[in-house]
Amino acid sequence: MLNDKDLSTWQTFRRLWPMISPFKAGLAVAAIALIINAAGDTLMLSLLKPLLDEGFGKADRSVLLWMPLVVIGLMLVRGASGFVSSYCVSWVSGKVVMNMRRRLFSHIMGMPVAFFDQQSTGTLLSRITYDSEQVAASSSGALITVVREGASIIGLFILMFYYSWQLSIILIVIAPIVSIAMRMVSKRFRSISKNMQDTMGHVTTSTEQMLKGHKEVLMFGGQDVETKRFEQVSNRMRQQGMKMVSASSISDPIIQLIASLALAFVLYAASFPSVMETLTAGTITVVFSSMIALMRPLKSLTNVNAQFQRGMAACQTLFAILDMEQERDTGKREIERAKGELEFRQVNFAYPARENLALKNINLHIPVGKTVALVGRSGSGKSTIASLITRFYDIQSGEILLDGHDLREYRLSSLRNQVALVSQNVHLFNDTIANNIAYARNENYSREEIERAAKMAYAMDFINKMEHGLDTVIGENGVMLSGGQRQRIAIARALLRDSPILILDEATSALDTESERAIQAALDELQKDRTALVIAHRLSTIEKADEILVVEDGRIIERGNHTALLATNGAYAQLHRMQFGE
């Protein structure tokens, strides 16, 4: 699980500020516009005194003539300032969220494979989408409310003190009480917001599992299981939402009750003779109206607190990910094309957060241009050995050498450029077939080279039958293709990459016998003059390997070529008899 540090609102906002500060000019314009907007409201209230005392009290017609023009002017200014403030704040928040998402996306993409082993895809998707939107809410809507309503409160206080400081000073007494109440509510909002974000991750994960495993759900009749699971996480989300509503609903009347008590006391104080002598109808109306008008910004600030705390809680969660260490790339050695000699020396390896060793004392040597095959039962450690060559994981002890140099001496990008991988779990992108074959290197290959690789992988047979050929968009993870077709695209990708080291991890597992024979010829051609590590369950595909290693429980228990291993009548011979029914 992702654990975020319990930071205060101020500490969290201070970390967010460097992402906002590049756009502070937009914030400044928005703040000025919001202050003008709030000043317009205050001036509107101040017009009540001349209207009542002069316009109606003394029947001064001139006041009634210029008053409408002032009102229209103030409304125009108020409307224009409202538009400017909303536009500027939305622009700033959009930029902040875009940059936050880019930074988060880039950071997650640079995390080690072990990170993805421990995190669900749904949770990470929720972080990039839902949590980022919560940041937008805190940096846009909340900011508008805080500045506008804050300016309104200041303006109204100035107006009240200007006309009657005696009555207005009473409101100073309630300020600490309101502050304490809001602080208590803030802690509750923060706690609920964190729970809501975690629950949203569970909702996304549950949905993602159903969508990805839809065929299995139908085949095994798991609709009730998935429905029940989704109902549980959805109900938890609803419960957290109701807790947020309850906290907000309780805080609103409490703060308004405090304010109304102060208002009642002001009315009582206004009846004192010493105070009444200084008041006119216009003055008491302005002061009283200002106090009533204070209710709206006070309520808005109370409500925005929940929104702001959601945003700050989301920030904490995102910062927790950004604080995680990315994949270490301490190597300095760059290499354009390796010879391809690989060697494992006394290698021991355990997966992160696991105590038991997955590989124990592994020793193997693959000379340049030779093919070594790994066989054994599922879970014996064959794929783990392959994953160490690309440094998806780092070993606990021992050495893995490429051309006589420790893998850790190479820059990761340079090392991985030397390896072409075809696994049983093929991932294709929602793009054209051509772009999938030339993935991430489209500009390096011509159309003819892409087509040649597809022909060598025996993929052009089905590609030519498609309406747009190589330009056919194949959908998410190649949903429009069969398992065998997807694997042929992956083989074409490896052929085009033309790396000196080739890893085939059950590369033909999804193919029928006829297609396997055809592709095996292409793979045999591909393996020429390359160092190849082949992992296979079908022993018929690795009989020609220069050396075969039998892996069991993380150890290499037998080694030799096909003929020699059959002659020893050991574990390999037993596997061979099981497959061929001898």
Curated annotation (Swiss-Prot):
Keyword entries, A-Z: ATP-binding, Cell inner membrane, Cell membrane, Lipid transport, Membrane, Nucleotide-binding, Translocase, Transmembrane, Transmembrane helix, Transport
Annotated SMART domains: AAA
EC code(s) of this entry: 7.5.2.6
A cellular-component GO term for this protein: plasma membrane
Bilayer topology annotation: Multi-pass membrane protein
Transmembrane segments: 16-36, 63-83, 153-173, 253-273, 275-295
SUPFAM superfamilies from the UniProt entry: ABC transporter transmembrane region, P-loop containing nucleoside triphosphate hydrolases
Annotated domain remarks: In MsbA the ATP-binding domain (NBD) and the transmembrane domain (TMD) are fused.
The protein, known as: ATP-dependent lipid A-core flippase
Organism: Pectobacterium atrosepticum (strain SCRI 1043 / ATCC BAA-672) (Erwinia carotovora subsp. atroseptica)
The organism's taxonomic lineage, starting at the top: Bacteria, Pseudomonadati, Pseudomonadota, Gammaproteobacteria, Enterobacterales
